[in-house]
Amino acid sequence: MDIIPYASAIGSIMDAMLCTRPDIAHALSVTSRYQADPGLEHWKAVKCILKYLRRTKDLLLVYGGNSLKVEGYTDSSFQSDVDDSKSNSGYVYTLNGGAVCWKSSKQDTTTDSTTEAEYIAASDAAKEGVWLKKFITDLGVVPDSEEPISLYCDNNGVIAQAKEPRSHQKSKHVLRRFHLIREIVTRGDVAVERVPSEDNIADPLTKSLSHIVFERHKGLMGIKHIGDWL
């Protein structure tokens, strides 16, 4: 594998992902973990991403929704990493019908429940929401920018814990730094709200999905074929 340009390919894929392709964020997050010592199967996975990008080179992010409003979505897998059983976080924020910022990453701590994994993911997403809210407020072009940004989550336990003023028995083992989300919610920067799992468009940033579900979420992130837009 010494002559395989694995790191170079990962860098090229990252350029595409950061600019316009949130749909490959999860695949990149997984394959980039093996840059130090990639195997043949890892290289095959990277080539699959490159082939997918070539096949879908006419896709672009489209902003043309009905309202100029920022909305966030957060989700996580549970102990999905095959090497250390850590979970994967993902979030995406949309504005005017298209994704404006997104992230897919492995969590740095092992969780023992889906609620804990999703709580950690929501905390990460909420911190990004704080920066995004300040940015759009300073721009002065988004109506109601002083209102909390809606951050949608499909886990009722996460929503309840995010609104708790103090830690309790169920969350005492969660690292304290993740409870920052409570301060963010109390301050009014972000409001954590419920969304059905099938409508959570952060799902593709955390796990592999069926083709139909993946394509639907991709469209809801604003990723369209250029032929459908022109």
Identify the meaning behind each predicted range:
Residues Y34, S67-K69, S87, S105-L230:
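RNase H-like nuclease module associated with reverse transcription
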Residues I13, Y73-T115:
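RNase H-like nuclease fold core
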Residues K51-T74, D144-S145:
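Structured nucleic-acid-interacting core domains from mobile-element enzymes and related host factors
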Residues A16-C19, Y52, T94-N96, D124, ...:
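Conserved catalytic core of Hanks-type protein kinase domains
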Residues R55-L59, Q79, A99-C101, F135-V141:
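Conserved helix-loop functional segments at active or binding sites
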